[in-house]
From Swiss-Prot:
This is Thiamine-phosphate synthase. The keyword Magnesium applies. Condenses 4-methyl-5-(beta-hydroxyethyl)thiazole monophosphate (THZ-P) and 2-methyl-4-amino-5-hydroxymethyl pyrimidine pyrophosphate (HMP-PP) to form thiamine monophosphate (TMP). Belongs to the thiamine-phosphate synthase family. It comes from Chlorobium luteolum (strain DSM 273 / BCRC 81028 / 2530). 2-[(2R,5Z)-2-carboxy-4-methylthiazol-5(2H)-ylidene]ethyl phosphate binds at residues 132-134, 163, 183-184. The gene is thiE. The lineage of its organism: Bacteria, Pseudomonadati, Chlorobiota, Chlorobiia, Chlorobiales. The keyword Acyltransferase does not apply.
Amino acid sequence: MNSPHSPILCVITDEDTSPLDMVPRALRGGANMIQLRRKTASGRELCRLAEALIPFCRQAGALFIINDRADIALATDADGVHLGQDDLPVAAARQLFGPGKIIGASTSSVDEALKAERNGADYAGFGHIFPTGSKAKGYKPLGPEAISLAAAALRIPLIAIGGITRENAGPLISRGAAGIAVISAVTKAESPEEAARSLMAIMNTTRAGEGT
C-alpha cells in the first residue's frame, strides 16, 4: 500500500449504528476506506455484513477492511484486515495472506509503528491523538506532535485516529499523516454523507495548500 495520492478517510463502523445504512452514505461523501468493526458480532454475522457491504465499496472504489478477524477477511475476499496489539501478529497475518491483501496495525508509539512496518504492515493506525470516548484507552492522548515524529520515521502510510473532528483534522495532514480514521465524527453525524464530505474536503484543502 503506497502513500495514496488522495488523503485516506477511513470510516470505522460502531456498535450502535447500522452499517448497512451508514456505510453507503459515508461512501457517497467520499470515504475511501471502510473498516467493519463489530466486537460483539458472531463470525456468521460479520460474514453477512461484509458480503452486504463489499459491493458498495467496490462500486465506490473504496477499500473494505475487517477489524481483527483475518479469517473473515479471507472468507469474504475483503481488501484486508486491521489488527490490534492483542490480535493475530502482523507477521503471522502476512504469512496467511501473502502479498495480495492489506494489513493495517493499531499502534500507539513510534516503536510499535516501526515494528508493524518491519513485520509487513501496509499502514499504521496511530493514536489516539486526541481524547476520545469511542474506545477505552489506558494511556493519555499522544497529541498531534507525535504524528510528525512517526511520519518521519515510517515508510508506510500513517493513519491518525482518536478524537478527530473537522476542527482538528487538517493539522494532522500537515504533520505528515496520510489520512484519518474516524468513528463518531461520521457515524454519529446527522448526515454521515455530509460529515465525510467535509472531512475529505478539509484534508484535500490542506494538501493542496502544501502543494502535495
